[in-house]
Design a protein with these regions (language model features):
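Short, structured coil segments at secondary-structure junctions
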Residues: 109, 124-125
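Short, well-structured alpha-helical segments
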Residues: 65-69, 85-86
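Short acidic-hydrophobic, aromatic-tinged amphipathic segments that line or gate anion-handling sites
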Residues: 78-80, 128-131
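Active-site neighborhoods of divalent-metal-dependent phosphate/nucleic-acid chemistry enzymes
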Residues: 73-118
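Short, well-structured N-terminal submotif of metal-dependent ribonuclease cores
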Residues: 1-43, 56-66, 123, 129-141
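Short beta-strand segments at enzyme active-site cores
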Residues: 43-45, 115
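Alpha-helix capping/helix-boundary segments
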Residues: 12, 47, 84, 100-101, ...
Length: 141
């Protein structure tokens, strides 16, 4: 079976990295599926800087640097190019960050977006799942 290819929203990666209860359980399960090769997951390049900024405030600069290093070993990075930004600007999303993630996801041809903010992606052409819903769909295959 071919592995699914997904893009993780920033909030899901922060749940994993900062062990944010009760959301961390699903984030850990998704990361474990990636580590086992059952899933390919991207994070957007812009998410990396946001994740570092928030993590640095919570766990300090050195630990945030180490955490980013681990994330880069586990996840692929979806580029945020001028084309991605222009595409995002042309979309009618209410949140520009969500539009950027959606356009980056399309650029790398993912099968789905995984987010805790599914309402932010109602205009996406891609299937959008919460982490829990994605895990249920994965286990049903």
């Amino acid at each position: 079976m071919t592995a699914s290819v997904v893009l993780l929203d920033t909030n899901v990666v922060l749940d994993l990295l900062l062990a944010r209860k009760p959301f961390d359980k699903d984030a850990v399960a998704i990361a474990s599926a990636v580590a086992r090769g059952e899933l390919v997951a991207y994070i957007a390049a812009t998410s990396v800087t946001t994740i570092h900024y928030i993590a640095r405030k919570a766990i300090g600069t050195l630990e945030a640097d180490r955490a980013i290093g681990r994330l880069l070993l586990l996840f692929q990075v979806a580029p945020v190019t001028e084309h991605v930004l222009s595409t995002a600007l042309a979309r009618a999303f209410s949140d520009f960050e969500d539009a950027v993630l959606d356009a980056a996801a399309e650029l790398v041809s993912v099968n789905a977006l995984i987010t805790r903010d599914a309402q932010g992606f109602t205009l996406s052409k891609l299937p959008v799942f919460t982490p829990a819903a994605f895990l249920r769909a994965m286990s049903a295959r």
